[in-house]
Design a protein with these regions (language model features):
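Catalytic domains of cell-wall/extracellular-matrix polysaccharide-remodeling enzymes
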Residues: 100-176
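Cell-envelope and extracellular/periplasmic
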Residues: 44-50, 67, 79-83, 105-107, ...
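Functionally critical loop-and-helix segments that line ligand-binding/catalytic clefts
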Residues: 1-36, 151-231
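N-terminal carbohydrate-binding/catalytic regions of secreted carbohydrate-active enzymes
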Residues: 2-76
Length: 231
């Protein structure tokens, strides 16, 4: 099976993401590495739709911060009213100045549209004064072909976390047109046991969701939580 491999493992790092259904030992994870590649960042599900709150988020976020992780929260978007979803997310994420904020834009039974995704991210931007990143894969690659130029410009100004279970990220839409980004901020290369190794880390069971940041842990820390909104 293929695996990620780098000549200088100090110049890349991993970011793990999970929700309450994923068993995780944060103390073990804080000490883990894979072939000398460290995992300094974690992104945890916080909310979904207009009212759901992940029951593990608050406890894990507090523990992770105490262990020195870079911490981020994500909201799983649905077709419900955007303003209500943004309020649900910000109320329960309770972001500090160092909490990363992300929208999970992917297929589900109550599908969020691209316009709603942009509106959600903008609402988070305006409420926090910094940018909300977007996580997606084929959902965005399909939706983006109908985007307006202003929507593409908006997305290009926000960090992209790509789900693409492969060694190298493919940065084109379903029509093979370049996405608004040249490279992703994060590349989720494995999940649910699919994609290149590693599929687990100490403290995270096999089938973990892991993403690659092409930069050192220090560079990831400097870029975290994400840039402020341009004035």
């Amino acid at each position: 099976m293929t695996q990620i491999s780098f000549t200088d493992p100090a110049q890349v790092c991993l970011v793990a993401d999970f929700y309450h259904g994923n068993p995780v030992d944060l103390e073990k994870l804080s000490r883990s590495n894979w072939n000398d590649i460290k995992c300094p960042g974690i992104i945890m599900k916080c909310t979904q739709g207009a009212g759901y709150v992940d029951p593990a988020y608050h406890g894990r976020a507090a523990q992770a911060g105490g262990l020195g992780f870079l911490v981020a929260a994500y909201h799983f978007g649905t077709a419900e009213q955007v303003s209500t979803q943004a309020n649900n997310f910000l109320t329960h994420a309770q972001p500090t100045a160092t909490t990363g904020l992300w929208l999970d834009f992917e297929d589900n039974k109550s599908q969020m549209g691209l316009s709603q995704a942009v509106d959600f991210m903008d609402a988070v931007d305006q409420a926090t004064g910094r940018t909300c990143g977007v996580y997606s894969g084929n959902t965005l690659k399909s939706a983006i072909i109908h985007a307006t130029s202003s929507q593409r410009d908006f997305l290009a100004a926000h960090a992209f976390w790509l789900a693409d279970y492969a060694l190298a990220p493919v940065m084109v839409d379903v029509n093979h047109k370049q996405l608004p980004w040249d490279v992703p901020f994060l590349h989720q290369f494995t999940g649910d046991g699919n994609g290149p190794l590693p599929h687990s880390l100490d403290g995270l069971q096999n089938g973990a969701d892991l993403s690659l940041f092409r930069g050192s842990p220090e560079q990831l820390a400097a870029a975290w939580p994400l840039p402020k909104v341009a004035s």
